């Protein structure tokens, strides 16, 4: 489940609780969806858009190739970047035996995409 607008039945909240507080911006919705499915909840997806929002400021994105490497490194551990603690938590929870590779690869891939 990936979404900014999600309706969660009370019964699901009773079953698995609320969002994991480790996720400050990224992956909280996906983690919740995985936990809900594991607990037996059904996930329904709307057939179209249910909302719209303005895109993030490009100059705040850590993968922006227009920024210096130093500035991108500063931005990577911000809520709109790829913050280390929640990314580590998500990789460890869902990455299987290769979770360290999954964790590191997300940063390598992001920096490679910003270079090429």
Question: PLM features: what roles do these ranges have?
Answer:
Residues 34, 38-114:
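Active-site-adjacent helix/loop segment of glycosyltransferases
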Residues 1-11, 74-75:
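A recurrent flexible, glycine/aromatic-enriched loop bordering the glycosyltransferase active site
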Residues 6-17, 22-49:
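A short, conserved alpha-helix in the catalytic core of glycosyltransferases
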């Amino acid at each position: 489940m990936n979404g900014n607008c999600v309706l969660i039945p009370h019964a699901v909240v009773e079953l698995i609780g609320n969002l994991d507080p480790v996720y400050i911006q990224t992956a909280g919705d996906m983690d919740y969806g995985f936990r809900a499915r594991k607990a037996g909840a059904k996930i329904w997806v709307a057939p179209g858009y249910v909302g719209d929002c303005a895109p993030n400021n490009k100059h705040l994105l850590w993968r922006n190739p227009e920024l210096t490497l130093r500035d991108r490194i500063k931005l990577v551990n911000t809520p709109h970047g790829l913050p280390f603690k929640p990314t580590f938590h998500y990789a460890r929870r869902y990455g299987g035996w290769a979770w360290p590779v999954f964790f590191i690869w997300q940063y390598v891939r992001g920096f490679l995409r910003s270079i090429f």
